[in-house]
Amino acid sequence: MKASVIFSTYNSEEWLEKVIWGFSVQTTKDFEIIIADDGSREATKNLIEKYKTELDIPIIHVWQEDNGFQKSQILNKAILASTTDYLIFTDGDCIPRKDFVETHLNNRESGRFLSGGYFMLPMNISKFISREDVLSQKCFDVNWLTQNGLKKSFKNNKLSAKAFKAKLLNFLTPTKPSWNGHNASS
């Protein structure tokens, strides 16, 4: 096992399932999923148990009693439950592209952390995304997104940029390195 993917959840079964679908089609399977559950109801546990039996990726469910917003505490417990020495953090409502884990693993360096971006979709598009859209990766295609309501914008270029165009856009629109919970690893 090369990495542990850690994300939190709280009574958000619809989003949790979409995220799990995204991890089910990763280009590498050499990782475990650790779901840091900040006191969700039984429905969340049942969904996780279902996918533990359906997927060929280990899923560890770390749960704590609901004592208000205790995300940092449950994330710390999830880190302790990890069986690897490389941790990838994301959010419980961020659907990963199929190369998410592989990209983190390919770019890791000892003594460094990686910080990636994310693209926040309007709620109506997020709710519209189906299992098939995630498994086929259509939900990451700019044309599909605009056909389903995403407004045209210059920032949409980052969604489909490859090779030279991606490097150029990163140069033109740099961001400061920061540790964030939606796309970071160390």
Question: What annotation goes with each model-predicted range?
Answer:
Residues E17, E42-K50, D99:
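Acidic helix N-cap motif at the loop->helix transition within catalytic regions
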Residues D99-G149:
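Conserved donor NDP-sugar-binding/catalytic core segment of glycosyltransferases
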Residues W21-D30:
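Short, acidic, metal-binding catalytic loop of nucleotide-sugar glycosyltransferases
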Residues T146-L159, F164-S186:
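A recurrent flexible, glycine/aromatic-enriched loop bordering the glycosyltransferase active site
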Residues G22, D37-N46, G68, C94:
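A conserved acidic beta->alpha catalytic loop
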Residues E65-S82, D99:
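Glycine-rich, basic loop-to-helix element that forms the pyrophosphate-binding segment
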Residues L87:
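Short aromatic/hydrophobic "clamp" motif used to bind/position activated sugar donors
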Residues D30-G39, I60-Q64:
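Short beta-strand/loop segment that forms part of the nucleotide-sugar
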